[in-house]
A protein has these predicted regions:
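Long, charge-dense, low-complexity tracts
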Residues: 1-131
Length: 131
């Protein structure tokens, strides 16, 4: 029983290490939550400092060198999407642009967030399995 508790505690600690928690301009929480809130327009991206976000990402990567590179890549994709969405907000719209609409970008971002959550859930299940 204590071994199971110890193993569960190790899983929780590892998951905490694998979560990028950002603290930028009045928001503190996981990066995927920030993206979700920005997608639903509950956080104003114009107030988020991309520089602070990038610095915190680099610090996270330095601390997480022993973690899987796929995890770092997922967070890089999320940070890049956040920067891209913010740039789309700050720049005037180009009527001749054939790129994706804001709704299409938000849908793609939601898909990426669902994919990341599915990977996390699967990783937790695999870590919790009996060996």
């Amino acid at each position: 029983m204590q071994e199971e508790l110890f193993e569960s505690q190790k899983i929780v600690e590892r998951m905490a290490l694998e979560t990028l928690v950002v603290d930028v301009d009045g928001f503190e929480g996981p990066l995927d939550l920030l993206l979700n809130l920005s997608r639903t327009q509950k956080v104003d991206l114009r107030k988020i400092s991309i520089l602070d976000l990038a610095v915190q990402y680099l610090v996270f990567i330095e601390k997480a060198k022993e973690l899987r590179i796929e995890l770092a890549a997922d967070y890089l994709v999320m940070a890049a999407w956040l920067a891209f969405l913010k740039s789309r907000l700050l720049l005037p719209p180009d009527p001749s642009e054939d790129g994706p609409s804001g709704d299409e970008l938000a849908t793609h971002l939601a898909f990426q967030l669902e994919r990341l959550q599915a990977m996390r859930d699967t990783a937790a299940k695999l870590m919790a399995r009996d060996r």
